[in-house]
UniProtKB/Swiss-Prot annotation:
It is found in: Cytoplasm. Keywords: ATP-binding, Cell cycle, Cell division, Cell shape, Cell wall biogenesis/degradation, Cytoplasm, Ligase, Nucleotide-binding, Peptidoglycan synthesis. It catalyses: UDP-N-acetyl-alpha-D-muramate + L-alanine + ATP = UDP-N-acetyl-alpha-D-muramoyl-L-alanine + ADP + phosphate + H(+). ATP binds at residues 129-135. Belongs to the MurCDEF family. GO terms for molecular function: ATP binding; UDP-N-acetylmuramate-L-alanine ligase activity. PANTHER family: UDP-N-ACETYLMURAMATE--L-ALANINE LIGASE, UDP-N-ACETYLMURAMATE--L-ALANINE LIGASE-RELATED. Pathway: Cell wall biogenesis; peptidoglycan biosynthesis. It is an enzyme of class 6 (ligase). Pfam families: Mur_ligase, Mur_ligase_C, Mur_ligase_M. This is UDP-N-acetylmuramate--L-alanine ligase.
Length: 480
């Protein structure tokens, strides 16, 4: 960071107290994308790691291969001689492992508290925001790695270049995603804090937008006096808190007043180009290998961070060009019989609109979207916003709400959402609750040139896997 004697800070600063007191760390819900990344870094640091999840997955198998003990299912007996138990927001308070930990007086801490300990290791960059955290974190990590900084990274998605959502680097930096969903990101104390945007999200925890804005304001002010907050000046809610931030601020966006700006934007399929300005100085051209206006914003945040770390602009250019995306963010899963299958994690109306606009930039023919709403509380709170989020879809299929440990709310259903969307569009909207029935239906309607997007944070991506498998069977039978 500019002005900081980084060469003198090349020490692992994870506290000596933690190393003396804690050897065995247990994760309840270890297969979750946020939990597994922390677990992987701790394994690389030499800690004994165990954990449990309701089902095994590629993620749990990967952790097992690194030395973790992973249990399928949650049982009190899964807790052996553990020193601390880490939980995610999806874990209920009556979870048997949590109850057993309390019975034994073993500390039970949220994921963010353990992440905070990891951030003490090195000079830390934490990326927050209602949308775009994972992509921006992975883009920053890619650029830093490309420039030879060899960062430690903890990301909320699988980065294709490393095949994982975490990596233990040998450099002096750590870059991590900061999840604001339950307010626990305020336990972090990064040297650089990024806020991509502020929106009405996680309304099961926050009382409203003012409450959300206050949390992000606290996050910006949590950085040390020598640190900085990197913020998107185009975001209207960020503008309202800017004057209350007491730390150095670096802004980006299209606004003329932003420190870093993108001008002369050019979109060509999956490739985006623009001229980058720092205040009045044109630094040069930027080429992105990923589509969408949201990725322009993500890249501007990345540039701001990289320049604070004294990276050269040619290194930044090369790193941005080499970035090809992160798992479950407009991820192409395959193309068979002329049908392209894409998966995207976006589950908030703002994210969905941006994702489908970016998809339209790349795929010009018929777009079929299979959407699985995520959480009853979100569907209820943002019902009206969801109604207008699918304007780019030529055919929309909505399946049942993914509960994510929530109990149903009376009247909040996928059928009601379908009815609302139908009232605003002439395009076809179908409610199909069963995944296998969705695949069967798709097999009757897909044509060469179609793009099928599975949209949502739950399990809807399995529909894409099934569709590709069925298409492959048909293709093979025709070739026989």
């Amino acid at each position: 960071m500019r002005g900081m004697p980084l060469n003198s800070m090349k020490l692992f600063r994870i506290t000596d107290v933690m190393r003396r007191k804690v050897r065995h760390i247990h994760f309840v819900g270890i297969g979750g994308i946020g939990m597994s990344g922390i677990a992987e870094v701790l394994l690389n640091l030499g800690y004994t790691v165990s954990g449990s999840d309701l089902r095994t997955s590629d993620t749990t198998e990967h952790l097992s291969s690194l030395g973790a003990t992973v249990f399928q299912g949650h049982k009190a007996s899964n807790l052996t001689d553990v020193d601390v138990v880490v939980t995610s927001t999806a874990v209920r308070k009556d979870n048997p492992e949590v109850l057993e930990a309390h019975r034994r007086s073993v500390p039970v801490i949220p994921r963010a508290e353990m992440l905070a300990e990891l951030l003490k290791m090195k000079v830390s960059i934490a990326v927050s925001g209602s949308h775009g955290k994972t992509t921006t974190t992975s883009m920053i990590a890619t650029v830093m790695a490309s420039g030879g900084l060899d960062p430690t990274m903890v990301i909320g998605g699988k980065l294709g270049s490393i095949g994982s959502n975490a990596r233990m680097g040998h450099g002096e930096f750590i870059v991590a995603e900061a999840d604001e969903s339950d307010g626990s990101f305020l336990k972090l104390s990064p040297s650089l804090a990024v806020i991509t945007n502020i929106d009405r999200e996680h309304l099961d925890f926050y009382r409203g937008i003012e409450d959300i804005k206050d949390a992000f304001l606290q996050f910006a002010n949590i950085v040390p006096f020598y640190g900085s907050a990197v913020l998107c000046l185009d975001d209207p809610h960020i503008k309202t808190i800017l004057s209350d931030i007491k730390r150095k601020t670096i802004t980006y966006g299209m606004e003329p007043a932003a420190d870093y700006r993108a001008q002369e934007l050019r979109f060509n399929g999956a490739v985006t180009e623009y001229e980058l300005y720092y205040r009045t100085e044109c630094l040069g051209s930027v080429t992105l290998s990923v589509p969408g206006m949201f990725n322009v914003y993500n890249s501007l945040a990345t540039v701001a961070v990289a320049r604070e770390l004294d990276m050269t602009f040619p290194d930044i250019q090369q790193g941005l060009k080499s970035y090809v995306g992160v798992g479950r963010r407009l991820e192409v899963k395959g193309k068979i019989a002329g049908v392209t299958v894409v998966d995207d994690y976006g589950h908030h109306p703002t994210e969905i609109s941006a994702t489908l606009a970016a998809a339209r930039q790349v795929w010009k023919n018929r777009m079929i979207v299979v959407f699985q709403p995520h959480r009853y509380t979100r569907t209820q709170a943002l019902f009206r916003e969801f109604l207008g989020a699918f304007t780019e879809a030529d055919l929309l299929i909505v399946t049942d709400i993914y509960p994510a440990s929530e109990d149903p709310i009376e009247g909040v259903t996928a059928e009601a959402l379908c009815d609302g969307i139908r009232s605003l569009t002439r395009r076809e909207v179908r409610y199909i609750p069963n995944f296998s029935d969705i695949t069967d239906y798709l097999m009757t309607v897909v044509q060469p040139g179609d793009t099928v997007i599975t949209q949502g944070a739950g399990s809807v991506n399995s529909v894409g896997v099934s569709l590709l498998s069925r298409l492959k069977e048909v293709e093979d039978s025709r070739a026989a």
